[in-house]
Amino acid sequence: MAAFRMGKLTTIPAGLIYASINVRLAKEEEPKKQLVRPDQLPIYTAPPLHSKYVEEQPGNLQRGFASIRTTTVYYIGWCKSIYLFMKNGVMDTVQFGKDAYVYLKNPPQDFLPKMGVITASGLAGLLSARKGSRFKKIAYPLGLATLGATVCYPAQSVIIAKITGKKAYATSQQIFQAIKSLWTQKSENESLPEPKEESKEGRSDEIHASLPDLKHSVSLPKELASATVIKSESTSGTTQFIPDPKLMDHGQSHPDDKDMYSTRS
């Protein structure tokens, strides 16, 4: 029994030593693990600090198509405006021809005499300016024909004159404003003369001359003058106040009965 116990006691420390050696070897064999923070994981990639947005530049093909498009749009708009102008002109001309045909088909009674007067006045102007300059050859027939039309159609002439006058006035105002703006710009560009600096002595003399003279005596009214004289007399003289003995208050006693009361405190 003693030998069995001794063997048991010797085997237990040996087993513990062997087990501790195995555990240590296993720990040494394990690879060393390093802890990583969450922001260091690859899913948390932070953008660079000096980032800058660069807009994509168009290529040669894109720029070529853009230039072709702008050119075609410009010419298409120009052709469209010309087409609309010609269309409106043709439509107005056709409508005017239709109205003139209807008017001439059934003219009023005084139409032919009025047209005869206008034509005769135009021919008279042409004959009167046949030996003159080109300006006279144009101005005289138009002027006399206009005068004849004004005489024959006074109401329409007044309306046309009003409209023409308003348009001429608006145009003259625009021209006047343009000329005025140019004139103001020229005047602003010109250097203004600098004012001369006055000396301090001259300024002080002017200030003294502009201020009123306060040393002169001012006349007061009679009431204020008498009040000031009375106050001055009362303050200048050393008058002594003498009270009336009848008005003196002696308390509970009369001056004649002063011996009847004791003066002890």
From Swiss-Prot:
It is a multi-pass membrane protein. Residues 1-27 form a transit peptide. Residues 130-137 are mitochondrial matrix. The modification Phosphoserine is found at residue 204. Residues 246-265 have a biased composition (Basic and acidic residues). Residues 187-215, 229-265 are annotated as: Disordered. The keyword Transferase does not apply. The chain crosses the membrane at residues 111-129, 138-155. Residues 28-110, 156-265 are mitochondrial intermembrane. Keywords: Membrane, Mitochondrion, Mitochondrion inner membrane, Phosphoprotein, Transit peptide, Transmembrane, Transmembrane helix. GO terms for biological process: cristae formation. GO terms for cellular component: MICOS complex; mitochondrial inner membrane; mitochondrion. It is found in: Mitochondrion inner membrane; Mitochondrion. Residues 229-241 have a biased composition (Polar residues). Pfam families: ApoO. Its main location: mitochondrion. Component of the mitochondrial contact site and cristae organizing system (MICOS) complex, composed of at least MICOS10/MIC10, CHCHD3/MIC19, CHCHD6/MIC25, APOOL/MIC27, IMMT/MIC60, APOO/MIC23/MIC26 and MICOS13/MIC13. This complex was also known under the names MINOS or MitOS complex. The MICOS complex associates with mitochondrial outer membrane proteins SAMM50, MTX1 and MTX2 (together described as components of the mitochondrial outer membrane sorting assembly machinery (SAM) complex) and DNAJC11, mitochondrial inner membrane protein TMEM11 and with HSPA9. Belongs to the apolipoprotein O/MICOS complex subunit Mic27 family. Component of the MICOS complex, a large protein complex of the mitochondrial inner membrane that plays crucial roles in the maintenance of crista junctions, inner membrane architecture, and formation of contact sites to the outer membrane. Specifically binds to cardiolipin (in vitro) but not to the precursor lipid phosphatidylglycerol. Plays a crucial role in crista junction formation and mitochondrial function. This is MICOS complex subunit Mic27. It comes from Mus musculus.
